[in-house]
Amino acid sequence: MIIIKRFLHIKTVPKSYGNQLSKFKYSKQIPTHEVLTKLGYITYPRAGLVNWSKMGLLIQNKISQIIRQRMDEIQFEEVSLSLISHKELWKLTNRWDQEEIFKLVGDEYLLVPTAEEEITNYVKKQFLESYKNFPLALYQINPKFRNEKRPRGGLLRGKEFLMKDAYSFDLNESEAMKTYEKVVGAYHKIFQDLGIPYVKAEADSGDIGGSLSHEWHYLNSSGEDTVFECNECHNVSNMEKALSYPKEIDETIEVSVIYFTTEDKSTLICAYYPSNRVLEPKFIQNEIPDIDLDSINDLSEFNHDISTRIVRIMDSRLSSRSKFPDFPISNFINRSLITTLTDIPIVLAQEGEICGHCEEGKLSASSAIEVGHTFYLGDKYSKPLDLEVDVPTSNNSIEKQRIMMGCYGIGISRIIAAIAEINRDEKGLKWPRSIAPWEVTVVEVSKQKQLKNVNDNNHHNNPQDNFQEIYNILNQANIDYRLDNRSDSMGKKLKQSDLLGIPLSIILGNQYPIIEIEVRGNKKNNNNNSWLQSYTENKDQFDWKVETDAQGNDTKHYIHKDGLVTVVNSLLNDM
């Protein structure tokens, strides 16, 4: 009889695993970007540049797969555009002169920081043959580049970053808004899949442009952004979008004024606000849409022009008794040309002020890390790039229809940095199950102890044969594990698995077929213990025992090998 021995594939830790740990003394005070380097996830060859190891790529790929699944569900198609773009398109959209653009030698090309120009040009060349090609929705996952002058924070602000950028193309605004809401729904699912609490905040569109946008944030004290949430209507807005009213007015406050004009220069705008606050000119735009947001310092051109119209806009923190500066145009006497707008919030909000959205609740401020942004662009790019399609009308004629666009970004490398920052403790990182490089580290008792146990107990079975049975079980159950087959001690291996943030560790020791499982990962929402239901149903069958800490959190599980898959899956489902 011929016996065919089945080849057993055992997945082991990468070569980069633990390489830098022998001299690394972890402390929670060490910046997260340094921790990621010491743990072997990434390296920085130069400030702002990053190399990814196998372990870092495993996390990248899991996040990318979550994004792909949710974007595919809403019928976005994946593409991959060139990372180099010609200046011609960027001049048409007035973005060629932005400081953060990486221009190549010869000043003809750039490394793309985002792809609105190129994707619009791609659609123009490929899909304008028929209006029936719309709606159209595309996305890509690839590197982007920013000429960051002072890179800092590792992956949070570098010269290169991994990004998912998506773009939608609709025949009208109504359909474009439906697409926007569809993407917002997909983003909620993506961030829920990632397993870390997040907020969606109303936002200013900034350099990207457009009339509607939302930012997606992780709340954390290290974040460079600030978001405000109302305790009544629960509106969440970023700093540049949060309108607020004072709890009470300080009539003794000093008043400052900054001058603007309308775009046609026919009207002088005087913005009065408390000297101890920060004016946000875009808030004035809510009342005066045609304001030129570049302030002016020289008012001499208005000194002799008595036909100039003047609008005075008063911040809501001021009253008629406030200490206003003198009016700058001394010979202006035509008061019929002066319009005064009062009680208008035009300064950046502060914590504890009244919500400008519902005008009832109080605002609380939180530091946050931005990891995603959704924009409704309208014709911001389709107009200068002439993206129009022939559409039949009701009277059987043909008319040009300008395409309405949206764009939607997620910073994959930023997510990795942010989650690493948020999910740290005194032992190291704590990756959510959804993006951990692997879910379970397997550690075997040393070969010497295996042999000693066989000799002491007169066992005939080779422990390695028993352990290979476990790898078969894990492989068949599609559990994402890695065996730490390095020569270090078991204690050191377990400590390093904790440090690197792997959710679970399985210990194959001398008590086999009883297996020990150590719990490292956080529970979702900090209160999800669905494993308890499985424990109640299976504890006797699998000889399942549990150790807890002083707070009642499960830290170790002991189970018979026959219950390994059931227990591991029930624990991972909580993480």
Swiss-Prot record:
Keywords: Aminoacyl-tRNA synthetase, ATP-binding, Cytoplasm, Ligase, Nucleotide-binding, Protein biosynthesis. Signal peptide: none annotated. One of its GO terms (molecular function) is proline-tRNA ligase activity. It holds the Pfam family HGTP_anticodon. GO terms for biological process: prolyl-tRNA aminoacylation. GO terms for cellular component: mitochondrion. It is found in: Cytoplasm. InterPro entries: aa-tRNA-synt_IIb, aa-tRNA-synth_II, aa-tRNA-synth_II/BPL/LPL, Anticodon-bd, Anticodon-bd_dom_sf, Pro-tRNA-ligase_IIa, Pro-tRNA_synthetase, ProRS_core_prok. It catalyses: tRNA(Pro) + L-proline + ATP = L-prolyl-tRNA(Pro) + AMP + diphosphate. It is an enzyme of class 6 (ligase). Its EC number is 6.1.1.15. Belongs to the class-II aminoacyl-tRNA synthetase family. This is Proline--tRNA ligase, cytoplasmic. The lineage of its organism: Eukaryota, Fungi, Dikarya, Ascomycota, Saccharomycotina.
